[in-house]
Amino acid sequence: MEQLWANKYRPQTFDELVGGAKELDYLTQSMQHLLLHSRGAGRGKTTLAHVIAKELDYTIHTFNASSKKTRGIAFVEEELIPLTSSGNRNQIILLDEADQLTPEAQSALKGVIENAHGYFILACNDISKVSDWIKSRCLQIHFLPIGKEAMKERLEYICGAEGVVITYSQLNLICEAHEGDLRNAINALQAFAS
């Protein structure tokens, strides 16, 4: 089975990031807990977390809080507390879909974040579901939709790398249909090419 292009062409460095995210390279100079948020998927939140980890040569532990297993207090107590108590300061704990954590789990995170060895990066689509306490302890970065020109540029790069011939109007349609969600636009391009 062919690799998804969204994964194959996922940026590995700040220079490869699309849109405003590439301006965030200063984050590696003074690492802190981060809360990355947007009003939609495919904006680069998770990718930014992985780029930061790679640039700092930190281990990254990724958890998706949208599953029943990882959104409750048991997950915080059984997984996160031991992980952040390990003494490894060169690690990032990425909680994707952090807005799906239960209020109890978010409350339990309070002590974990305060005493963590390493750094938390929380990514979410609905910041209103994240507790005020977490918001106050993290640098908040809002991700805007990826601009149409930046999307086109990235899709054109992928077309060149994959040998895909596409018209300007077809490329435009893909960008317009996916309104700032680069991941879905790349998936649509791959479907078009196959």
Task: Describe each model-derived feature in a short phrase.
Residues 1-150, 158-160, 168-176, 184-190:
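P-loop/Walker A NTP-binding region and its immediately flanking N-terminal helices
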Residues 163:
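Inter-helical turn/loop segments and adjacent helix faces that build the functional surface
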Residues 194:
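Loop-to-helix "switch" segment enriched in basic
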